[in-house]
Structure formats: C-alpha cells, structure tokens
Amino acid sequence: MEHNGSASNADKIHQNRLSNVTEDEDQDAALTIVTVLDKVAAIVDSVQASQKRIEERHRVMENAIKSVQIDLLKFSQSHSNTGYVINKLFEKTRKVSAHIKDVKARVEKQQTHVKKVEAKQEEIMKKNKFRVVIFQEEVQCPTSLSVVKDRSLTESPEEVDEIFDTPVDLSSDEEYFVEESRSARLKKSGKERIDNIKKAFSKENMQKTRQNFDKKVNRIRTRIVTPERRERLRQSGERLRQSGERLKQSGERFKKSISNAAPSREAFKMRSLRKTKDRAVAEGPEEVREMGVDIIARGEALGPISELYPEALSETDPEEASATHPPQEGGEVSTPEPLKVTFKPQVKVEDDESLLLDLKQ
C-alpha cells in the first residue's frame, strides 16, 4: 500500500512538472504570436501610408499635367497670334519698302533739280549782273520770284553795263543757301532712315530672327512635352481613329443586315393574296358569288397553285394541297378542274396595294 501511494505521488509530481512546462511553452508561443502580429500591423500601416503618399503624388502629377496642357493651349494661341502679327508686319514692311522706293525716286528728282539750280546760280554768281523786275497788276502777285536771264548778257557784257543800272541787293542768295541746307539735311536724314530700315528688314536679319524664334519654340516644346510622350500621344490618337473606323464599319454592317432581314413589299403582297384566298375558301361558294366573283370553266387546264406561286406558299401548303387533292390509285395524279381567273381592281388589304387573285376549283 505504501509503495502504491508513493508511486501515485510520483506520478502527480511528474504531471505537475509537465503542466508547468506546457504552460510556459504556451505563454512563449502567445508572446511570439503577439510580437509577430504587431510587426505585421506595423508593416500594414507603413504600406497604407506609402499608398496614400503614392496617391497624393499621382494627384499632384495629374494637376501638373493639366496645368501643362493649359499652358500648351495658351502657348499655341499665342504662337498663332504671333504668326498673325508677323504676317501683318511683313505686309507693312512691303508697303514701307514700296513707299521708300517712291520717296527715293522723288529725292533723286529733287537732287537733279537742285543740281540744275546750283549750276544756274554759279553762272549768275560768276557774272554777278542780273536784274529783278517787280510789278503788280490786277492779278495777285505770285509768292515765288522768277529770275530771268537775258541772252544779251552772254553776248556783250560791256553794253549791258552801260544800259543797266547797278543790281539791287535783295539778299536772295542767303535765302537760297538756307533752302539748300534744309534740302541737304532732309536728303541726309531720308538716306539714313532708308539705310536703317534696309538693315533692320534685310534678308539676313529676318532669317536670324526666324531661326532664333524657331530655336526658342523647340526648346519650350522639349521642356514641356518630351518626344517619348509626344510619340505616345500620337499612337493613342491613331488607335482612337482606328477604333472609330471600326465602329463605323460595324454600324454599316448592322444597317445592311437589318435591310437584308426586312421583308420586301412583294412578300407582303403574296401574304395578302394568301389571306384573301383562305377567306374565300372558308366562306364558301355562295358568299363568293355575293362578292361578285365570276368563275367560269374553260378548256385550258391550269397547274396547281404551288407551281403558280412557289415563293408565296409556305411549308404547310404542300400538305394542304395533298389533303385537298389526294393521289388516285394506280399512281395517277389527279388533274385539277379548269378555272377562270378574274382580276379585281386595286383594293387596300392591310394598308398594302395589291391585285386580288380569286381562285376556285
């Protein structure tokens, strides 16, 4: 008994030890699971935060792309406006060049006139003997004075000295020199302006300005839209165009199929004929006579209705014909009785105009 009691005590102690060990292991496992779950939760939170950041970046990128598109539209509008303004400037330069040519021709004419006047003045100054006659009549005096040169001055100057008095000093030379200086100034200023305009609107300068403008435009384009993105946009446009063409083709095919599937007017007419024939057969010979159908037998034999109108009869018509005309014994086919066919005037049957054919065997 004592031995059994000691054995039972030992078993209890061993079981207690095992239970303690299992409890410790369970606690350790629970702790590890909790730590792992915490790590997983931290990872999930970090992933969600990164996803939110990515979404925000995508929104920012979309806004930037929209702003870039708006800038592109504005730039295209400004580019078109600048092109229009440049064309106007070219037209104005052409007009200015034509006006400059006219002014140049006028200046040359004035220059020749001035040279002639200078030559005359030199001759007069060399001789220093001229006379100015001033008189007034009923007509108003002209504002400009005309200097008359007498031929006798060149022939005999000594006789002229005896005849004429000393010339009056009218200080006309000083006035003329002032006018000559003004004309020279105008001439110089006109030439300088013409030269400046020619230099500004020369072919070389215009080509340089065009090249610089094209370079700036290309730089702005490459900064705003890369060539890869431009190629992608072009490909997407081609795809959209192809899809539109396919949709058009499918719509045309659908229309054709509907038009082919729709019954024709002849089919409606044949159906109306069949309905009238069925009504006439159902009503009987008396009602047909009342309607005014005149059937008279003739010597000519007509074939069955299926031969006359093969398209109008349906699949059940041959069966009805076989029921109404059963084949005779010995393989002989019964010939139908002769008929007279009468046509009525046009009558509307179900809103379709057709000729009614009344047949009776």
UniProtKB/Swiss-Prot annotation:
Coiled coil: 100-124, 204-248
Annotated localization: Cytoplasm, Myofibril, Sarcomere; Cytoplasm; Cytoplasm, Cytosol; Cell membrane, Sarcolemma
Chief place where the protein resides: cytoplasm
UniProt keyword terms in alphabetical order: Activator, Cell membrane, Coiled coil, Cytoplasm, Developmental protein, Differentiation, Membrane, Myogenesis, Phosphoprotein, Transcription, Transcription regulation
Residue numbers bearing the Phosphothreonine modification: T335
Any one GO cellular component localisation term in the record: plasma membrane
Keyword NAD in annotation: no
Pfam hit, one: PTRF_SDPR
GO annotation, biological process: cell differentiation; muscle organ development; positive regulation of transcription by RNA polymerase II; regulation of gene expression
Modified-residue entries (Phosphoserine), positions: S152, S171, S172, S354
Region (Disordered): 1-21, 230-283, 310-346
Protein origin, superkingdom: Eukaryota
Basic and acidic residues: bias regions: 230-255
Family the UniProt entry places it in: Belongs to the CAVIN family.
Oligomer status and interactors: Component of the CAVIN complex composed of CAVIN1, CAVIN2, CAVIN3 and CAVIN4. Interacts with CAVIN1, ADRA1A, ADRA1B, MAPK1 and MAPK3. Interacts with CAVIN2; this augments the transactivation of NPPA.
Task performed by this protein: Modulates the morphology of formed caveolae in cardiomyocytes, but is not required for caveolar formation. Facilitates the recruitment of MAPK1/3 to caveolae within cardiomyocytes and regulates alpha-1 adrenergic receptor-induced hypertrophic responses in cardiomyocytes through MAPK1/3 activation. Contributes to proper membrane localization and stabilization of caveolin-3 (CAV3) in cardiomyocytes. Induces RHOA activation and activates NPPA transcription and myofibrillar organization through the Rho/ROCK signaling pathway.
Protein name, entry field: Caveolae-associated protein 4
UniProt lineage: Eukaryota, Metazoa, Chordata, Craniata, Vertebrata
